[in-house]
Amino acid sequence: MNYRPLGRTGLKVSALSFGASSLGGVFRPVDEAESIRTVHAALDLGINFIDVSPYYGATRAETVLGRALRGIRRERYYLATKVGQYGEGEFDFSAARVTRSVDESCARLGVDYLDLVQCHDIEFADLDQIVGETLPALARLRAAGRIGHLGITGLPLRIFPAVLDRVEAGCIATVLSFNHYELNDSSLADLLPYFGRLGVGVINSAPTGMGLLTERGVPAWHPAPPAVVAGCRRAVEFCRARGVDIVQLAIQFAVANPAIATTLVGTANPAHLERNVAYAEAPADPGLLEEVLEVLRPIRNHNFTRGRPENRDPILA
């Protein structure tokens, strides 16, 4: 496993990290014992960064993860969770709620401090509140030793400079972006030099586009435009015809960029996790990668957006 610095946090994180949303049964019904085995397998394979949220499975993911981590030395892993989103359409970024949220997460996870706490999907928030209320409340917890570092997460890329440009240097240590550094959409790359100048660590999530780049395909709720779904399906079939699982290429593409500290993958299946780690540790076939990127060129960087109107990215026609 390769390890990279997470911005200026002083943390060296595995290039592939564990997204614990699957432990909450977000994508399919999961067995708790299997979920716990998956967490243990991740640590044994060298993954040292775990990301979760109280939103995933209505706190179930944090609860199961806490059980999995029971008895494991705290120095073996870095633990990140989130505040602000607690149910479908249920957001509360007030100082009182996020302060209480940190205490609740620590209790569920069985820890007395968190390495990273992130404001969850801030495109649904008033960014004035994030800057003026939420982050100062979390900074007080950081000063008290409950939190190591602060981060922000979301889908629209515009939200990151919209907040980072308004806070003191060092206030925000990380950004978590998803669906914007994958085979069909690498628009996050445009912001990487900016994050680098600020010393902000970049966490990439959803390298398969939340199912777009998989044999199984997208779930019914997936918001991608039909043209994007169809274009990704062509890439899946192209890889299949060449005897390659497109997930392999997607993971290899995501972890190859040294400006991205870590890429999150989520699964509650130990065998799938072992497969993903093996993919990440092997280089991509450059010829195949070039061919697949060409297949995807007509939909390149075409994606969906969401959030408050003022926080949304423009959509390519």
Tell what function each PLM region has.
Residues L11-L16, G46-N48, R73-Y77, V111-D115, ...:
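Short, well-ordered coil/turn segments that N-cap beta-strands
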Residues L6, F18, S35, I50, ...:
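Conserved, mostly hydrophobic/aromatic
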